[in-house]
Structures are given as C-alpha cells and as structure tokens.
C-alpha cells in the first residue's frame, strides 16, 4: 500500500496578503533528513506589501531559515496542514488507505500539504508550481453528501468519485472528528458531523457550550445546528474569511502551539501562563485579551471542556502584531468520574480542572482576586440561567440533559480546593446545580 503514496520533497507556499483576494507565491518548502525547511522567494521579499509569514519564526530575509529548537518544520506551516481527520480523508480518497493503516506508512508532511484542499484555515496554501496557482477542490457539496462521505471514511470504505470531491474540500481542516467546509453566498462554515463512535450527542454538546460561552460574554464563533441525512450537523461560521467585491479575503492565523514554539510532541508543556506572557508583549489590546483568555479558561472548566489543547487557541497575524481569534472547539468531554485535568497547564505545573486553579493564576492575567471571582460568579449564573433555553434550542434529549448537567457542566470537582472568600462559589454552584431542572 505504501508504494502508492508519493513522497514529495518540495512545495511552494502561496499566501493571501492582508486585504487581497488573490494569492502570491511566498517561497519554497523542501524536505530533507526528516525536516521541512523554508526559504522566501526573491520576488516576495521585494514585494512592497510583503509581510513575514510569522515572527520570530520566519523573518523576511534571504536564504534557508533555521528551524526553531525541537521543531521538524515551521510551526506556522504545520498550522495549515490537516490533522487526524483530514489525513484520513486524503489517504482514503487518494490512496485507498484505511485510517488504522496510517501509522504504518512513512508519509511526508508535504504530501498532506499538497493533497489537501486549498480553502484551508488561515491565509496559506501549497502548490506544485511557483508560477501558476491552481486551487484544489472548489466543488460545493450538499450537507447530505458530506454526511455520507464522512460515514464512508470512518468505516474505511473507498469514496465514490462524487463523494470524493464532496469531502476533499474539507481535508485541510485540523482536528480528529468528521468535518468539512461548506460555503454559501456570503458566509463560509466548518460543518462538524456526528461520529459512529459517539456514545452521546457530541455535536449538540458543542453547540450548547458555544452558545452558552457567547451568552456569558466570551467572543465565540457563531454556531447553528441543522439536520442532514438524519444526522445532527454543527455549522461553525468561519472567522478567517471576509467576503468582498471580487472574492474572498483570507486572514492569516497561527495557533497557540506555534506561538509557544512547540509541536505536537511537546504539546504537554503548553501553558496558559506562558501564553499570557506572550499576550502582554506581542498582542493588540493585551489587557482585554488577558481577561478574555482567563474567561475562556474558566468557561472550559465550568462546561467540562478538557480538550483545550494549544491548537484550540489561535490568533490573527498581521505581520507585526497578534490578535486573539474568536473562541472555537469548546466541546464538553466525556467524563465518568469527577477529577479531571486540562490539556494545557494553567500555571506552573498545575492543570487540574478546578476553579481554584484559575483563581491562583489570576495575577498572570492582570486580574485582581475580586475581578477573577466576579468573572466566575457571572459565568455560573449565566450558564444556569440559560441552560434550559439553550438545551431546548438543541432539542437535547432528557437522557443527554441528565448526562451533561452536573457532570460536564458544573461538575462538583471544579469547585474543590476553594478557600476563604472563594468558597462562596462552591455554595453557589451547589445551589444552581440543584435548582436547575436538567
């Protein structure tokens, strides 16, 4: 099977510069000795409107740019590559490889960059040519076609040509769950599908969490819930695209993993404390951004989203400064007991999913103890007040309501280890948990 998978050793990076609706070639990627290196093209360096793809990683200068310590390819490039789901789609559609066979194949990162769809998250794309840009997978499939395609990929069944084209469009998206990209006249969405392995309504859980986050004052991506082919589909409005006369502008983005100069093998070291330090020095509106990030950490704990890894946080990049993107991928995780931990460290070596962890770290976000307490209390009351209405919007079954409420949402473990004046939060959580009819 591996003989069918080509190993590309070079690719050309194309980028949509700020305000533009067409890309220009930025430079060349080449694979060597297990690494992927980048150099800018002269035409791009001499372009008056050119910006670095990301600093300090890829400064706008001539020659091969050294990789940051520990990395095998530039992080801002890896951000544009597909993750688990997109790789399964590519291997299925292109090479007939089932998902569980991926680990046995020696596949170049450039293969995934060059075989994935062109409408990827952010402002980059990858081409075989430095002079001719040819977008891949422009077909706009129906949700029903996409649902059917996702089901076949999960089962390892080769796609038909029609379904192949339908799902390829979303093969460049990150994440492990089934998803695809869709477009209407003025808005683009990421469509997230139910999985055959789901033991409860994961899609509805994410819809509820995202809606509640927005109601709690968090800048969260807009979401809607629809049905297609008898399945729930979550539509997440893309915030990296702007519709203008003549086409679409793309907004450059980098993940927190890239900001922290880490890769997947080092992701366990990713820390909100370190991210807060970067925000203070490199972000627009640092004080407001720190408060927003603190609020997101609190909400993740209150809703049971322990999958808050560093690729689930991102910032727009304008060539000089970073700006936090809307929140996304806030999804309550399955939980059999109480004790839990976050994917990212909160401060020091502490990643425990407790409000006490947030309060202890508040000073890193330039928040006083009373300010941090007020944020937690406000979210608690907001979640409890809006839970019945948002659950109804999601047509959540009684079984799933009982599963989510008090287990993912407002799990008692989140309120352990609170001391002094903060202990009022535990009492408030107990009151709200018991007063709201799931």
Model-flagged regions — what are they?
Residues 1-310, 314-438:
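Phosphate/dinucleotide-binding and metal-coordinating scaffold of catalytic cores
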């Amino acid at each position: 099977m591996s003989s069918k998978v080509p190993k590309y050793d070079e690719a050309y990076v194309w980028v949509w510069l700020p305000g533009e609706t067409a890309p220009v070639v930025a430079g060349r990627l080449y694979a060597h000795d297990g690494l992927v290196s980048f150099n800018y093209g002269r035409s791009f360096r001499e372009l008056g409107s050119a910006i670095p793809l990301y600093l300090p990683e890829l400064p706008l200068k001539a020659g091969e740019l050294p990789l940051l310590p520990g990395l095998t390819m530039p992080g801002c490039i890896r951000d544009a590559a597909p993750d688990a789901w997109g790789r399964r789609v590519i291997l299925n559609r292109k090479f007939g490889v089932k998902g569980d066979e991926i680990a046995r194949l020696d596949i170049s990162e450039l293969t995934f960059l060059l075989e994935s769809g062109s409408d990827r998250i952010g402002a980059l794309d990858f081409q075989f040519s430095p002079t001719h840009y040819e977008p891949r997978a422009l077909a706009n499939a129906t949700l029903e076609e996409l649902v059917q395609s996702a089901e076949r990929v999960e089962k390892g069944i080769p796609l038909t040509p029609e379904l192949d084209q339908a799902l390829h469009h979303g093969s460049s998206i990150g994440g492990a769950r089934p998803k695809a990209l869709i477009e209407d006249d003025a808005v683009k969405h990421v469509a997230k599908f139910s999985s055959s392995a789901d033991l409860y309504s994961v899609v509805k859980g994410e819809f509820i969490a995202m809606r509640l986050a927005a109601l709690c004052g968090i800048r969260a991506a807009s979401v809607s819930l629809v049905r297609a082919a008898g399945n729930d589909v979550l539509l997440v409005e893309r915030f990296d695209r702007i519709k203008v006369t003549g086409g679409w502008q793309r907004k450059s983005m980098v993940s927190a993993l890239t900001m922290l100069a880490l890769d997947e093998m080092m992701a366990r070291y990713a820390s909100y404390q370190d991210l807060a330090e970067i925000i203070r020095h490199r972000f627009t509106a640092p004080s407001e951004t720190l408060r927003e990030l603190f609020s997101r950490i609190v909400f993740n704990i209150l809703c049971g989203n322990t999958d808050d890894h560093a690729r689930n946080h991102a910032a727009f990049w304008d060539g000089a400064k970073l700006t936090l993107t809307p929140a996304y991928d806030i999804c309550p995780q399955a939980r059999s007991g109480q004790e839990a931990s976050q994917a990212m460290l909160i401060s020091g070596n502490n990643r425990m999913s407790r409000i006490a962890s947030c309060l202890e770290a508040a000073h890193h976000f330039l928040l006083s103890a009373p300010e941090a307490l007020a944020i937690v209390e406000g979210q608690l009351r907001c979640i409890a007040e809006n839970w019945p209405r948002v659950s109804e919007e999601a047509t959540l079954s009684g079984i799933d309501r009982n599963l989510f409420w008090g287990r993912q949402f407002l799990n008692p473990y989140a309120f352990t280890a609170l001391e002094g004046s903060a202990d009022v939060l535990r009492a408030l959580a107990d009151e709200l948990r018991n007063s709201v009819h799931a």
